[in-house]
């Protein structure tokens, strides 16, 4: 049975675990009305529309 000969240091252990942590790029879509970039499933901050309806006042 495989047993480690030496103890793995915390730095080596943490570096190995951190290799799997990758940030994903933010998904951005264009607003159909004003063509500004907007996060999906959120009202457009520039024109205030969501799913073709006016939700908030335009800023």
Curated annotation (Swiss-Prot):
The keyword Magnesium does not apply. GO terms for molecular function: structural constituent of ribosome. GO terms for biological process: translation. GO terms for cellular component: large ribosomal subunit. It comes from the Bacteria. Transmembrane segments: none annotated. This is Large ribosomal subunit protein bL32. It comes from Anaeromyxobacter dehalogenans (strain 2CP-C). The gene is rpmF.
């Amino acid at each position: 049975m495989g047993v480690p000969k030496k103890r793995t240091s915390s730095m080596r252990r943490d570096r190995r675990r951190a290799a799997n942590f990758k940030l994903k790029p933010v998904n951005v879509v264009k607003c159909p009305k004003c063509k500004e970039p907007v996060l999906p499933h959120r009202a457009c901050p520039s024109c205030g529309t969501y799913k073709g309806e006016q939700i908030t006042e335009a800023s």
